[in-house]
Amino acid sequence: MGTVDYAVEMRDITKRFPGVIASNHVNLAVRRGSIHALLGENGAGKSTLMNILTGLLRPDSGEICVRGERAALRSPAAAIALGIGMVHQHFRLVQTFTVAENITLGMSRPRFALDMAPIEREVAKLSSEYGLAVNPRAKIWQLSVGEQQRVEIIKMLYRLSLI
């Protein structure tokens, strides 16, 4: 069990790839309501650590606690369910989908079963509220790099990510 004061704790996290140890017994604790930045040289393991936290990779050893409870982050869906989100440096967007469709990817209900109109309205509201101008009906391939970055940010706002 972790400390409830922390939004997330990563303890003794190790991740190996063939020929390299990407994360070697890393510890990270982030208090609720605080802002942290990971800094380091290329290849230092920052992205690996964040990919573990968001369920894209599994650690070889170590444990993760979210809000004081041990968490098994076996997939991005598991991380999303715990309120963990990440604005990716390399966008994880489907080019042929709309902004609104991309925002709903990975959520609990299948995309084809969703009525997109309320989602588009909410995306437009978040876009306006946070000054992140983007058209919810635009296809990703139609957007500039800056607009695609805004979609990644709006995705986390829409999902109410806590971490």
What label would you give each PLM region?
Residues 1-163:
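Glycine-rich phosphate-binding loops of nucleotide-dependent enzymes
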